[in-house]
């Protein structure tokens, strides 16, 4: 879905940043395959490990390290007196596809700005948002577009309010598991209607649900953007 959003926004050159774990690498490969099939171009694929400094990976993605290396070579040949150097980032990236949790995202987005890439659109997976309205903490995520479940995004849902008041509050993955349970219950009563084509979609807690010709359930997530530290519903086209 992130690939479709980026493509419809007119972007064609993608950079991918993901954690260095097998399950995330599979997601990276899936996104890359979808993007290339659309006719897009991948200009950078990078991974990170750990929870500390993201400078190296961002410098690599934006080719800042190459710019610094060229400057060092030049300075080795010329007198260094009164010479100043400002690194330049590559200019062929239309957007960045990011897989990260909120803590990682809060470090990666400002690091992009530090390395002259704060103007590049960032599209992320649902993992970037834990469902908590930490406005001050989430300021560092401003501008990131991501897809997520309506249940996580909509804090005013009457059923969510009722469940939250009667059960232990949860966040992140547990919120999403709760939403899956709700949709499983709702879908069971509607499977015959789907099969008989009496309905073609159902607005669920995990997204807009539909059934393919071979009986597979698909879902379309809501689109959101961080604005002033708040996850706000955004246009899906």
Task: Set out the residue ranges of the language-model regions.
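Extracellular/periplasmic Venus flytrap/periplasmic-binding protein
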Residues: 1-103
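Surface-exposed patches in mature extracellular/periplasmic domains of secreted proteins
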Residues: 14-19, 44, 120, 174-177, ...
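Active-site proximal loops enriched in glycine and acidic residues that flank catalytic Cys/His/Asp
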Residues: 18, 100, 124-127, 148, ...
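Bacterial peptidoglycan biogenesis and beta-lactam-recognition machinery
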Residues: 38, 116-117, 194-198
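Short hydrophobic alpha-helix segments
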Residues: 45-46, 235-237
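Extracellular/periplasmic periplasmic-binding protein-like sensory domains
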Residues: 62-73, 91-93, 109-182
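Segments of small-molecule ligand-sensing domains
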Residues: 165-235
């Amino acid at each position: 879905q992130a690939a479709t959003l980026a493509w419809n926004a007119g972007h064609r050159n993608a950079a991918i940043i993901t954690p260095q774990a097998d399950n995330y690498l599979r997601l990276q490969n899936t996104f890359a395959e979808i993007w290339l099939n659309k006719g897009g171009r991948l200009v950078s694929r990078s991974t990170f490990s750990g929870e500390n400094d993201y400078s190296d990976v961002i410098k690599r993605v934006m080719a800042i390290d190459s710019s610094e290396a060229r400057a060092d070579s030049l300075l080795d040949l010329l007198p260094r007196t009164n010479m100043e150097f400002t690194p330049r980032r590559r200019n062929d990236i239309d957007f960045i596809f990011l897989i990260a949790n909120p803590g990682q995202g809060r470090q990666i987005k400002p690091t992009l700005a530090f390395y002259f890439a704060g103007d590049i659109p960032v599209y992320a997976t649902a993992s970037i948002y834990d469902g908590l309205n930490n406005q001050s903490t989430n300021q560092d995520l401003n501008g990131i577009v991501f897809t997520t479940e309506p249940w996580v995004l909509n804090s005013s849902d009457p059923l969510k309010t009722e469940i939250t008041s009667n059960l232990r509050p949860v966040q992140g993955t547990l919120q999403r598991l709760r939403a899956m349970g709700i949709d499983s219950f709702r879908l069971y009563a509607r499977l015959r209607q789907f099969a008989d084509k009496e309905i073609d979609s159902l607005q669920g807690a995990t997204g807009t649900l539909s059934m393919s010709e071979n009986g597979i359930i698909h879902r379309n997530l809501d689109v959101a953007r961080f604005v002033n530290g708040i996850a706000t519903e955004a246009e899906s086209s």
